[in-house]
Amino acid sequence: MNDNVHFILLAVFLCALCILGTRFLKNYKFKQLLNCIKNQDVSRFSQIANSRLTKLLFPPYNIEYLKLNAFLLEGDEQEIDHQFTKMLDFNLGKTQRCDLLLKAYDYYLSKRNKKQCKSILKDIKSLEEKELYQDALKCYLIIFEKCTKYVDEMESQLHSMDSKEKSYLEYLLSIQYENLGDSNKSNFYKEQSLIHSS
C-alpha cells in the first residue's frame, strides 16, 4: 500500500476514535450530573457542570436546564428565580421555550406567585398554542381569581383520564370547592388527588 492509503486509513481511524471518545465522555459526564441531582449533591454538581470539559461537551442550554433541576430539588428559591430568568433570555426554539415556560409556570403556581404567573401566562399566550394557553389560564383563574366555573366540566372529564391527569384535575377541583366553601368536597378531591398522584 502506498503512503496515501495509510494516511487515509489513519485519518479515518482517528476520526472514529474521536467520535467514540466524545460519545463516551458525554455519557459519562451526563451520568455524573444526573447522579449528583439524584443525590442532591449540588456542590459536586456545580463543580462538574462548570468544568471546561462539560462546557465543551454540552450546549449551554442543556447545562443550565440541569442546573435548574438541581436548584428545584434543593429548593433554593433565589437560585431558581435567577435560573428561570437567565434561561428565558436564551434564544430557544418553540418546543424548548414551551417546555421551559410550562416548567416555570407550574413552579410559580405551586408557590402561589401571582405576579410571575401572570407574566409567564403572557409569554405562553405569545406561543400561539391555544389549548395550552387555555389550560394555563384556567389554572390561573382557579388559583388566583377564585374561579369556580370549571367544576362541572372537570368532573365530567375525570372518567376518561389516566391517574396523573386525574390527580391534577382533582387538585383543581379541590381548590374550586374550597373557593365555593364546600370543605367536604374539597377534602374529598384533595385526598383523591393524593391517591392518584402516587
Regions picked out by a protein language model, each given a short descriptive name:
Residues 22-96, 120:
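N-terminal topogenic membrane-targeting module
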Residues 133-159, 164-178:
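Soluble C-terminal extramembrane regulatory/interaction domains of multi-pass membrane proteins
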Residues 21-31, 56-65, 93-102, 128-138, ...:
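Generic helix N-cap/helix-start motif at coil->alpha-helix transitions
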Residues 170-198:
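Alpha-helical oligomerization segments
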Residues 43-52, 76-89, 113-128, 149-162, ...:
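Alpha-helical repeat scaffolds
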Residues 89-115:
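Alpha-helical transmembrane segments and their immediate juxtamembrane interface regions
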Residues 36, 71, 108, 142-145, ...:
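Residue at a conserved register position within TPR or TPR-like alpha-solenoid repeats
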